[in-house]
């Protein structure tokens, strides 16, 4: 297998359980106890999925232990029996608190804030049974409480189970297939724009029935869903639909702690002495001289989404496989270390600057709250925080990669605290912070999407899913870069404001990013053996230069 050492079979019960779970999550046939989770293609989101499955067997694992001990033989001693009471399995009802990212959403006061969704269009060549589909969505809305939320005057409210039914809008597509696309797009746009935050439902579903199979649109307001949530929902949709079709009473894994409980615990955590130590890191970041503005081709006061255009590139399956596996052996890196180095090199080439600010987005489900398990919880947990890409060593790729890796490791709790400080912590605890750093560019690596191909029930439809975001809502950033892996290929998309950038400008930047990424892949594959950095040794005070001198002496 890619990234494997010589195969060493699991021996104990726990080693076998971990090996089975890794095989399921990573889609591999054989995993030994000395194989590295990350060089097998794992990432932090795969780590969450692994922890979720482990939890279903009555065990827990903290993500930091997976990152520090990424082989089964090392990790096995860090797996613990789940203690304390299981999450409440009853329905969540009544008022709740906003999470930091939800507070960001309402602070921005977007136009058409009701039309700010995430969506997916599924295709089943054998069709979806409308009655089973509607029942499946009902089961999901009962189980995943966030899907029953509404927002009145920016206050979250969970409705009861009597409001868990979801209406499935069914459209019969007659006539030639080439005419279907326009109708699907028209009806999908209508469904996407019909969500009401005040009255709900925040989930809309449309079933388009055609001779070549059915297309199912699921649109959910972003306030209650994120990338990890979609993985959970698609997995559960497949499971419940299949059980109902077989005539079984549908069963799902136990609920993990609720989105409401997460928001409540964050409120308490935000003013604790242990957490407030993070403020020093963000204050130092704010004090640095940094380039946050991209060189625009022209200026525009019109920031509406309708002016967004996109360019993208994809790597070959072979390049993607290397990027997911062997590349990380050279410097013990993770995906973001590589992608952000390529981004920084391309930005330096474009702006001529050495120190460049970007907004980073992460899944936000970090292990910061003791005893809280949110591995199978649906909600909007995303973290959003500024990072400074230091590109002074761009001419020395080895040093630059190691520097980027160390800079990322120094971000406390993967940046989740920035939003907590900004939106939840009491004013007297953050007087030295301005929260004014506002880069033009945002970056988000979403991980791997295998739920479509693994399902057996559906694939991603090629039909239009309508506009997830209102064309009249404001674009938060001038340039949004999103990366993901689907069907074995890495794709990077560049969504830009067309009144500020020419297409050729962004195409040139995309080409530069891809070129640097391929150079990094080649560089890492050409290294003789792994090279350690201070974070590998667990030493926060040791610098790269000091470690290099030590290694020379040794």
Label every model-predicted segment.
Residues 53-55, 90-162, 167, 177-269, ...:
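Acyl-group handoff/entry surfaces in thioester-processing enzymes
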Residues 30-35, 48, 52, 93-96, ...:
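Gly/Ser/Thr-rich phosphate-binding loops and adjoining beta-strand/alpha-helix segments
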Residues 10-18, 129-130, 180, 184, ...:
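Hydrophobic (often cysteine-bearing) scaffold residues that line and stabilize catalytic clefts
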